[in-house]
Amino acid sequence: MIFALLSWLAQAGAQESFNPLETNGMVRIVVAHGDHLLNAFLPDQARVEAVFNRGLTGFTRQNSVTGAWLSLLSTNDIVGIKVFSEPGPVAGTRVAVVAAIVHGLMAAGLPPDRIIIWDRHLADLQVAGFGSLGQVLGVRVAGAEEAGYDTNTFYLPDSPVTGQLIWGDLEFGRTNKDFNLGKKSFVSKLVSRQMTKIISVTPLMNENAAGVCGHFYSLALGSVDNTRRFEGNPDRLAVALPEIDALPVLGDRVVLHVTDALLAQYEGGPAGYLQFSTVRNELWFGHDPVALDVMALKELMLQRRLLNVPLMPANFAIYTNAVLLQLGIADPARIGIEKTP
């Protein structure tokens, strides 16, 4: 499987444009493409929403947007829309994509007070424009750190690395002799106590240690504290990201993964750099975060080759470990990609 994955990713350099492997595999990824979704790198809300709805109905095989959403969740759920807002409004998860989700959920009968747009830091959400969106639509916008962390729900790896605790971490400032002090990453109360379903929406953006700021990177590091011990270290990320996402309070609640591929940023992430970005005008839909993140790695490698930019290491071990935990499929022969008409 790993040889097949490496070969598939390597083929990106030989292609003139992104043409994912078309198969009848066990995993479906739906790609929705539109024309002129961006104007001077800013999304056209109406066009983005139309393409999003086309992709959603195609992925769920439903005849209506309402039917699509109700096939994934119920109006009694509390839905958390996990965004990646750190890069800002242009390069991070885009407000227009999330607005399309909120409009669809509300039209399907979900009350606005049962919708939460969230990320790790409230300040990042505000800068990225989600605070304003929340005010306009009447939905909550919340930071995982500001909500506090749950002492009863945590990640403790088999071979823990003691973290350098900082302000905001649950155990910061404690001076007791607890053997496990700094070895746990506690899940935010926002996740463990305030939502029943999660929709993950990530940009198509590189990250040097993880390869891509994808669904594993965004959900894992956005949901728990004491993450400095993993960040920037490819080996530690390869273990921690899949294991955190495998926590039932996280992985079992995700009903949809959406990759915001309106732009592809192949260098500089997680900061936003338009000079390292190309327009893709696409949204990708799937249940499998492994397949989507592997697909993102391939696309970013392709962009670097097309632009004669030196290739960056891709952290394949994340997805090897994720497959071992049965979180998804990385074998390209088992990833079927459908393009909406």
What annotation goes with each model-predicted range?
Residues 1-8:
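Bacterial N-terminal signal peptides
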Residues 15-75, 86-88, 92-99, 106-341:
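Extended, low-polarity segments enriched in aliphatic/aromatic residues
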Residues 8-16:
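Bacterial Sec-dependent signal peptides at the C-terminal "C-region" and cleavage site
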